[in-house]
């Protein structure tokens, strides 16, 4: 076969005969061939849940089918679009399409074909970020430069960045657009120093028209990489090239980020994305169902949208889980079936009531302090500091009064509790180790 896409399409036709229609529609139909390297065929699955299911339930069947077609024993590897964006694409059609990139020693733009402005669902939480992204795509380096988009995981930051890239290339096929994560930027920079190819690295990223860099917060604490990105930023900005940056937090909240970088990130426009509201979540589910060719009852979409309000990735994953569950037990989808399918991933609707004793036990576990020491008169730092953390969390996570908290810590005065709360609050603004420990305690208490 000339092209691995042809090979995979032939394999899909055979697989369609071997599995039930619901199974084929749910798991196999939306897969695509990514590349074939050293007898390993990489297949792209639409999401993590589908990838994991394919790996555990269909790898052997797929290998057998491919052997029947080719006579070769191929190993099968599954990836999702996000991880695909970090790899080199080997499809001949793609190589030919981007020949101009290779001639300039530039990386592939690595854009996910599913992440466009047309597939982006607009809601109150992302409307401004969408408008800003579209403005940048329509007039690179003229509207907002840089554009800094921040928000939680799975809310659409990466989608908007890819959409910008697609739009620019569609309207200017010769534009040099590069998307990468800050982690990849860091790794390539380190390798360039090791291999004495620093000049090649700089030329690679300072000669693009649009640079889309994801998860910039991972540059925190990496002084040399920040230095390199600072100069890359300057070179692109001075040449009026567009820079788009994403992060899980605004520039001012990224710890150990150099002030000069923080200042430059604030030169253009900073916009955030917040979790989608109910109407937007329903719209996202409808668009996902339509894209996957799934017929989902309204009551099921409403149930999922009401239960999953954290991010889009979990929302779409829940939908796929319900569809899979329905096909496996061979029952029609309804709200009751959705509840059964999602019972292990939906948080308990009754929030856990945290007690001061719970907090003392959790802090004691992290800091190796015995429960009785929280009430004792010991003032050694190894006990006193964890005790202050426990007082702080008791104030933050319970409804207990100051005197009540003091009483639970060996009858201490309420002013001691106030002092502990103020001290820990102040330290949390700068002490990353303390931040980590407090989050660890909170995770234990969940």
From Swiss-Prot:
<dbReference type="InterPro" id="IPR024633">
    <property type="entry name" value="DnaA_N_dom"/>
</dbReference>
<feature type="binding site">
    <location>
        <position position="156"/>
    </location>
    <ligand>
        <name>ATP</name>
    </ligand>
</feature>
<keyword id="KW-0547">Nucleotide-binding</keyword>
<dbReference type="InterPro" id="IPR018312">
    <property type="entry name" value="Chromosome_initiator_DnaA_CS"/>
</dbReference>
<dbReference type="Pfam" id="PF08299">
    <property type="entry name" value="Bac_DnaA_C"/>
</dbReference>
<dbReference type="Pfam" id="PF00308">
    <property type="entry name" value="Bac_DnaA"/>
</dbReference>
<dbReference type="InterPro" id="IPR013317">
    <property type="entry name" value="DnaA_dom"/>
</dbReference>
<dbReference type="GO" id="GO:0016887">
    <property type="term" value="F:ATP hydrolysis activity"/>
</dbReference>
<dbReference type="InterPro" id="IPR027417">
    <property type="entry name" value="P-loop_NTPase"/>
</dbReference>
<dbReference type="InterPro" id="IPR013159">
    <property type="entry name" value="DnaA_C"/>
</dbReference>
<comment type="similarity">
    <text>Belongs to the DnaA family.</text>
</comment>
<feature type="region of interest" description="Domain II">
    <location>
        <begin position="81"/>
        <end position="109"/>
    </location>
</feature>
<feature type="region of interest" description="Domain III, AAA+ region">
    <location>
        <begin position="110"/>
        <end position="326"/>
    </location>
</feature>
<feature type="binding site">
    <location>
        <position position="157"/>
    </location>
    <ligand>
        <name>ATP</name>
    </ligand>
</feature>
<dbReference type="InterPro" id="IPR001957">
    <property type="entry name" value="Chromosome_initiator_DnaA"/>
</dbReference>
<dbReference type="InterPro" id="IPR010921">
    <property type="entry name" value="Trp_repressor/repl_initiator"/>
</dbReference>
<dbReference type="GO" id="GO:0005524">
    <property type="term" value="F:ATP binding"/>
</dbReference>
<feature type="region of interest" description="Domain IV, binds dsDNA">
    <location>
        <begin position="327"/>
        <end position="446"/>
    </location>
</feature>
<dbReference type="GO" id="GO:0003688">
    <property type="term" value="F:DNA replication origin binding"/>
</dbReference>
<dbReference type="GO" id="GO:0005886">
    <property type="term" value="C:plasma membrane"/>
</dbReference>
<feature type="binding site">
    <location>
        <position position="158"/>
    </location>
    <ligand>
        <name>ATP</name>
    </ligand>
</feature>
<keyword id="KW-0446">Lipid-binding</keyword>
<dbReference type="Pfam" id="PF11638">
    <property type="entry name" value="DnaA_N"/>
</dbReference>
<dbReference type="GO" id="GO:0006270">
    <property type="term" value="P:DNA replication initiation"/>
</dbReference>
<comment type="subunit">
    <text>Oligomerizes as a right-handed, spiral filament on DNA at oriC.</text>
</comment>
<comment type="function">
    <text>Plays an essential role in the initiation and regulation of chromosomal replication. ATP-DnaA binds to the origin of replication (oriC) to initiate formation of the DNA replication initiation complex once per cell cycle. Binds the DnaA box (a 9 base pair repeat at the origin) and separates the double-stranded (ds)DNA. Forms a right-handed helical filament on oriC DNA; dsDNA binds to the exterior of the filament while single-stranded (ss)DNA is stabiized in the filament's interior.</text>
</comment>
<dbReference type="GO" id="GO:0006275">
    <property type="term" value="P:regulation of DNA replication"/>
</dbReference>
<dbReference type="GO" id="GO:0008289">
    <property type="term" value="F:lipid binding"/>
</dbReference>
<dbReference type="InterPro" id="IPR038454">
    <property type="entry name" value="DnaA_N_sf"/>
</dbReference>
<feature type="binding site">
    <location>
        <position position="154"/>
    </location>
    <ligand>
        <name>ATP</name>
    </ligand>
</feature>
<keyword id="KW-0067">ATP-binding</keyword>
<dbReference type="InterPro" id="IPR003593">
    <property type="entry name" value="AAA+_ATPase"/>
</dbReference>
<dbReference type="GO" id="GO:0005737">
    <property type="term" value="C:cytoplasm"/>
</dbReference>
<keyword id="KW-0235">DNA replication</keyword>
<feature type="region of interest" description="Domain I, interacts with DnaA modulators">
    <location>
        <begin position="1"/>
        <end position="81"/>
    </location>
</feature>
<keyword id="KW-0238">DNA-binding</keyword>
<dbReference type="InterPro" id="IPR020591">
    <property type="entry name" value="Chromosome_initiator_DnaA-like"/>
</dbReference>
<protein>
    <recommendedName>
        <fullName>Chromosomal replication initiator protein DnaA</fullName>
    </recommendedName>
</protein>
<keyword id="KW-0963">Cytoplasm</keyword>
């Amino acid at each position: 076969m000339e092209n691995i896409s042809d090979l995979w399409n032939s394999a899909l036709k055979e697989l369609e005969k071997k599995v039930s229609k619901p199974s084929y529609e749910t798991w196999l139909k939306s897969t695509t061939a990514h590349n074939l390297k050293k007898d390993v065929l990489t297949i792209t699955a639409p999401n993590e849940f589908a990838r994991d299911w394919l790996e555990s339930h269909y790898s052997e069947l797929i290998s057998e089918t491919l052997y029947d077609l080719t006579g070769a024993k191929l190993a099968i590897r599954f990836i999702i679009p996000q991880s695909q964006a970090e790899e080199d694409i080997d499809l001949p059609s793609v190589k030919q399409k981007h020949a101009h990139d290779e001639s300039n020693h530039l990386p592939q733009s690595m854009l996910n074909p599913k992440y466009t402005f047309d597939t982006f669902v607009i809601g109150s939480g992302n409307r401004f970020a969408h408008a800003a992204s579209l403005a940048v795509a329509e007039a690179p380096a003229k509207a907002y430069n840089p554009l800094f988009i921040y928000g939680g995981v799975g809310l659409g930051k990466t989608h908007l960045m890819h959409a910008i890239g697609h739009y620019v290339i569609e309207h200017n096929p010769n534009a040099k657009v590069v998307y990468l994560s800050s982690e990849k930027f860091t790794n390539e920079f380190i390798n360039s120093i090791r291999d004495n190819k620093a000049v090649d690295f700089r030329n690679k990223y300072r000669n693009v028209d649009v640079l889309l860099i994801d998860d910039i917060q991972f540059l925190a604490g990496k002084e040399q990489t920040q230095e390199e990105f600072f100069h890359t930023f300057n070179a692109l900005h001075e040449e009026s090239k567009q820079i788009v940056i994403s992060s899980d937090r605004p520039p001012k909240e990224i710890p150990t980020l150099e002030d000069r970088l923080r200042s430059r990130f604030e030169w253009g426009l900073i916009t955030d994305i917040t979790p989608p509201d109910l109407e937007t979540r329903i719209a996202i589910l409808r668009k996902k169902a339509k894209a996957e060719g799934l017929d989902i009852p309204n009551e099921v979409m409403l149930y999922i949208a009401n239960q999953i309000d954290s991010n889009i990735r979990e929302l779409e994953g829940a939908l796929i889980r319900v569809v899979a569950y329905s096909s496996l037990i061979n029952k029609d989808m309804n709200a009751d079936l959705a509840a059964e399918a999602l019972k292990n991933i939906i948080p308990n609707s009754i929030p856990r009531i945290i007690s001061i004793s719970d907090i003392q036990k959790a802090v004691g576990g992290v800091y190796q302090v015995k429960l009785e020491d929280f009430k004792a008169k010991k003032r050694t730092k190894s006990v006193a500091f964890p005790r202050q953390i426990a007082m702080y969390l008791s104030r933050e996570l319970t409804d207990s009064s100051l005197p009540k908290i003091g009483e639970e810590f060996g009858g201490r005065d309420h002013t001691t509790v106030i002092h502990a709360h103020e001290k820990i609050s102040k330290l949390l603004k700068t002490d990353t180790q303390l931040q980590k420990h407090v989050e660890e305690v909170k995770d234990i208490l969940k």
